[in-house]
């Protein structure tokens, strides 16, 4: 069985041969981390076009190795809160073995094309595998227009431990600008649409990232308040959804502190 180092070399060779990302046509690195970065940069920039079976077989083997390199996080590993159906997980959302994770997508719904970018959209698409971009392209082709803010779409999670990914596009906030009622409602719609879709798909566990708080600039405090209030209100309006366990995933210490505070019943964002 080829090593991850060798698999990366073969994948890079195939991607460079395509010449779809010729700006990254450079010698094959000798260091593992450099190969990882080059492969990720190439696949990040690659258009949503069919891939060869040879490439997909290599990618499957490489991502299977990646998947075996960590212990997935289940609901029972998550932090309990004062609400029986709400949990917290501080860490990498890619490691969650739940029915679905929520991806903060953009209006193209094809993932992030910036090489090695640090956004959640890039991380999820890279390690779910390139089939995810193709699946999203099929959705967008059928839809025939950009994805609207506050909607939600469901795909397989492919190589991630989760079974599915729910993609939603949140509102943008210019730095220093006040959060208008319209944008607050658009963010709330992201949560409602994702919850509605999860129930429609028969899911029993759903992990939310902090939608719009990264590249889209939504203030973290207001975003956390909206997220929790929206989920609690949705639960009250959908008593039949008691079987749906909801996890709030935090990645920064600031987000964790906010959710820790607001998920105490005496501080429930009212």
Curated annotation (Swiss-Prot):
Cofactor list: Zn(2+)
Q: What top-level branch of life does the organism fall under?
A: Bacteria
Output the CDD domains linked to this UniProt entry: Macro_OAADPr_deacetylase
**Protein name per its UniProtKB record:** Protein-ADP-ribose hydrolase
Q: Which family does it belong to?
A: Belongs to the MacroD-type family. Zn-Macro subfamily.
Known function: ADP-ribosylhydrolase that specifically reverses the SirTM-mediated mono-ADP-ribosylation at an asparatate residue of GcvH-L, by releasing ADP-ribose from the target protein. May play a role in the regulation of the response to host-induced oxidative stress.
Q: Which residues bind ADP-D-ribose?
A: 92-93, 106, 119-121, 212-216
> Per the UniProt record, which EC number(s) apply here?
3.2.1.-
Q: How is the cofactor bound?
A: Binds 1 Zn(2+) ion per subunit.
Q: Entry's InterPro entries?
A: Macro_dom, Macro_dom-like
Q: Which residues bind Zn(2+)?
A: 112, 117, 119
Q: What organism does this protein naturally occur in?
A: Streptococcus pyogenes serotype M18 (strain MGAS8232)
Q: Which residues form the Macro domain?
A: 73-267
């Amino acid at each position: 069985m080829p090593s991850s180092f060798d698999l990366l070399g073969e994948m890079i060779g195939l991607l460079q041969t395509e010449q779809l990302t010729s700006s990254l046509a450079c010698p094959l690195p000798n260091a593992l981390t450099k190969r990882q970065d080059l492969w990720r940069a190439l696949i990040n920039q690659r258009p949503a076009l069919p891939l060869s079976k040879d490439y997909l077989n290599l990618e499957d083997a490489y991502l299977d190795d990646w998947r075996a390199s960590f212990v997935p996080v289940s609901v029972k590993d998550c932090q309990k809160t004062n609400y029986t159906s709400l949990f917290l997980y501080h860490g990498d959302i890619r490691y969650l073995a739940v029915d679905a994770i929520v991806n903060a997508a953009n209006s193209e719904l094809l993932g992030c094309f910036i090489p090695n970018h640090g956004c959640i959209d890039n991380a999820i698409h890279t390690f779910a595998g390139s089939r995810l971009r193709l699946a999203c392209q099929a959705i967008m082709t059928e839809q025939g227009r950009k994805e609207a803010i506050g909607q939600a779409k469901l795909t397989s999670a492919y190589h991630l431990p989760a079974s599915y990914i729910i993609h939603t596009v949140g509102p943008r906030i210019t730095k220093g600008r006040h959060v208008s009622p319209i944008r607050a409602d658009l963010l709330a719609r992201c949560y409602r649409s994702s919850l509605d879709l999860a129930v429609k798909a028969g899911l029993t566990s759903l992990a939310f990232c902090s939608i719009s708080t990264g590249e889209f600039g939504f203030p973290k405090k207001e975003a956390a308040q909206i997220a929790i209030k929206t989920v609690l209100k949705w639960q009250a309006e959908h008593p039949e959804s008691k079987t749906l366990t909801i996890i709030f995933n935090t990645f920064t210490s600031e987000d964790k502190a906010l959710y820790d505070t607001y998920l105490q019943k005496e501080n429930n964002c009212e």
